[in-house]
């Protein structure tokens, strides 16, 4: 099924209409924040996911035209039966809102700064953001750096991160940023009916130097850009499942033996919370098939690891064969950790 607003892939009826996650959240924000928009053109702008709808006035009008109707600010993903249900529902809604805000920053801004991973973790404002315009250069270097930054910012907003030691925090982010980016691109590609990972505006995830290195043998590139999205298509992963999987992956205390005892306890306790929430979601959506669904979802991690490792290896090979080619410092930090 496709979203009746922007034609992206859709799985649920939101506010009475089959719509995608992005349009659902756009409509929700507009209504509940009483936002007003004006069309700069002739009130007939094209609203399509491939062009990343820019006219909010026409987008909202289309939402109304196709029959979207707001219920109340207490509109929930699942029915509320008790306090446990309330906490579960609040968790899902908070994650959806947080992710939506993060994705908006990713596609709406860019930066010319070149800080290291450590610099950003210590003070993310060092990455001075500039709003994109139609004239903004949209190359793979810019998008990959911004994707990594957006993933770092997303996780930094969780309170438990502030409790971690600096060295443990750096290790945790070095391991997870590329994997989180891979999952994010897979979810976007899946939502937009794309067969492989791409950046917005269909910008390739590989620099031209990688194609030059591979020549006519692009099987590895096709595997890296296609295998994760293939798994998403196979499992028909929902937005809520993706968001919980992301946190289950991030809170993995076993990625190194060097974490402090305190960090291991914090990560393990939070991973248990997100694992429990994911299993509960499976129970609500799939009933008796919940254990099978839960196991299938966790199998995504193995494929993500393989894709990230292949990407890191290719990046290393590019730099070996073309010493003049340099990734930004943030990407160098991430790739060097994957290969260490």
Swiss-Prot record:
Keywords: DNA-binding, Metal-binding, Nucleus, Receptor, Transcription, Transcription regulation, Zinc, Zinc-finger. Disulfide bonds: none annotated. GO terms for molecular function: DNA-binding transcription factor activity; RNA polymerase II cis-regulatory region sequence-specific DNA binding; zinc ion binding. Residues 1-75 bind DNA. Residues 98-337 form the NR LBD domain. Its main location: nucleus. A zinc finger (NR C4-type) spans 3-23, 39-58. Belongs to the nuclear hormone receptor family. This is Nuclear hormone receptor family member nhr-268. It comes from Caenorhabditis elegans. The lineage of its organism: Eukaryota, Metazoa, Ecdysozoa, Nematoda, Chromadorea.
């Amino acid at each position: 099924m496709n979203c009746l607003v922007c034609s992206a892939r859709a799985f649920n009826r939101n506010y009475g209409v089959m719509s995608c996650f992005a349009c659902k959240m756009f409509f929700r924000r507009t209504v509940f924040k009483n936002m007003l928009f004006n069309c700069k053109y002739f009130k007939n702008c094209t609203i399509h996911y491939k062009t990343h709808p820019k006219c909010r006035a026409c987008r909202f009008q289309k939402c109304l035209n196709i029959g979207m109707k707001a219920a109340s600010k207490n509109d929930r993903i699942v029915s509320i039966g008790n306090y446990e249900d309330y906490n579960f529902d609040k968790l899902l809604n908070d994650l959806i809102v947080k992710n939506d805000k993060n994705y908006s920053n990713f596609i709406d801004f860019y930066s010319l700064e070149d800080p290291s991973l450590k610099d950003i973790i210590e003070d993310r404002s060092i990455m001075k953001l500039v709003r994109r315009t139609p004239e903004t250069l949209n190359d793979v270097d810019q998008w990959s750096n911004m994707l990594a930054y957006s993933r770092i910012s997303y996780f930094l907003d969780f309170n438990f991160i502030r409790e971690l030691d600096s060295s443990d925090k750096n290790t945790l982010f070095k391991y997870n940023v590329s994997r989180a980016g891979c999952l994010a691109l897979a979810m976007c590609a899946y939502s937009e009916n794309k067969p492989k990972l791409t950046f917005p505006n269909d910008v390739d995830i590989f620099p031209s130097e990688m194609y030059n290195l591979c020549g006519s043998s692009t099987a590895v590139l096709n595997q890296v850009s296609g295998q994760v999205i293939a798994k998403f298509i196979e499992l028909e992963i929902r937005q809520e499942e993706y968001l919980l999987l992301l946190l289950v992956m991030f809170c993995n205390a076993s990625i190194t033996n060097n974490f402090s005892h305190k960090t291991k306890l914090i990560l393990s306790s939070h991973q248990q919370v997100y694992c429990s929430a994911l299993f509960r979601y499976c129970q609500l959506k799939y009933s008796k098939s919940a254990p099978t669904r839960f196991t299938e979802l966790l199998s995504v991690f193995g494929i993500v690891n393989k894709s990230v490792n292949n990407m890191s290896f290719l990046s290393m090979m590019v730099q070996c064969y073309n010493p003049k080619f340099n990734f930004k410092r943030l990407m160098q930090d991430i790739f060097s950790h994957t290969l260490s």
